[in-house]
From Swiss-Prot:
Pfam families the record matches: NTP_transf_3
Organism for this UniProt entry: Sulfurimonas denitrificans (strain ATCC 33889 / DSM 1251)
Name under which the protein is recorded: Molybdenum cofactor guanylyltransferase
Keywords: Cytoplasm, GTP-binding, Magnesium, Metal-binding, Molybdenum cofactor biosynthesis, Nucleotide-binding, Transferase
Compartment(s) of residence: Cytoplasm
Enzyme Commission number: 2.7.7.77
Biological-process GO terms, alphabetical: bis(molybdopterin guanine dinucleotide)molybdenum biosynthetic process
Task of the protein: Transfers a GMP moiety from GTP to Mo-molybdopterin (Mo-MPT) cofactor (Moco or molybdenum cofactor) to form Mo-molybdopterin guanine dinucleotide (Mo-MGD) cofactor.
Domain of life: Bacteria
Gene Ontology terms, MF aspect: GTP binding; metal ion binding; molybdenum cofactor guanylyltransferase activity
Predominant subcellular localization, coarse grouping: cytoplasm
Binding site for GTP: F10, A11, G12, K22, D67, D98
Family the entry assigns: Belongs to the MobA family.
Subunit and partners: Monomer.
Lineage: Bacteria, Pseudomonadati, Campylobacterota, Epsilonproteobacteria, Campylobacterales
Length: 193
């Protein structure tokens, strides 16, 4: 079964800790990490978009949502605003390009417990909020615009000050995040194990 909720892969970050664009790193049998994510998430969602600064950096076909050109920043805030402007749906599933081990069961659980009365339904692992893994509702659109105006880009702060429902998970490996070169190498080893 494919979910109707649109999925957004956020791939517009600066990747400064990685030293190169992590979305474009080879991953498994795929030319890029973002293609790996796109392939796997397309088995879960009917519609998958890639949120990015510039779609021209990708040499494959996909549904892209580019950040608003007047926003010269590398923060998810810009991506979220563009997504809200582009989509007509009330909600969407947000996932970061650098978390390739999020499982179908995690996504299903988040989608099943989500309610229209929530502003967001977000994963938590060992008490730590995972703001780039969860469902965001249109009710947060105005708050994202305010954050941008205030040059505030902390998703955790936004979620703590909104009607957010958290879902606790225990499997830390599923939330493994690729920020540094050694984490990329660890992820490749995990993928091949």
């Amino acid at each position: 079964m494919l979910f109707d909720t649109p999925c957004i892969i956020f791939a517009g970050g600066k990747s400064s800790r990685m030293g190169e664009d992590k979305a474009l790193l080879p991953f498994g049998s795929y030319d890029t990490l973002v293609e790996f994510q796109l392939y796997h998430l397309s088995k879960i969602f009917k519609t998958v978009y890639i949120s990015c600064k510039e779609k021209s950096k990708f040499n494959f076909e996909a549904a892209f949502i580019e950040d608003i050109k007047t926003l010269p920043l590398y923060a998810p805030t810009a991506g979220f605003i563009s997504v809200y402007n582009h989509l007509k749906s009330d909600n969407f599933f947000a996932i970061s390009v650098d978390t390739p081990f999020i499982t179908r069961s995690i996504i299903e659980k988040l989608l099943h417990v989500d309610k229209n009365t929530h502003d967001a339904t977000i994963a938590k692992v060992n008490g730590l909020i995972q703001p780039m893994c969860g469902v965001y509702h249109r009710s947060l659109s105005e708050k994202f615009s305010q954050m941008l105006q205030n040059n505030s880009h902390k998703l955790g702060y936004l979620l703590k000050n909104s009607n957010t429902f958290y879902v606790e998970f225990e499997d830390e490996k599923s939330f493994f995040n690729l920020n540094h070169p050694h984490e990329y190498q660890e992820a490749l080893a995990l993928l091949n194990s």
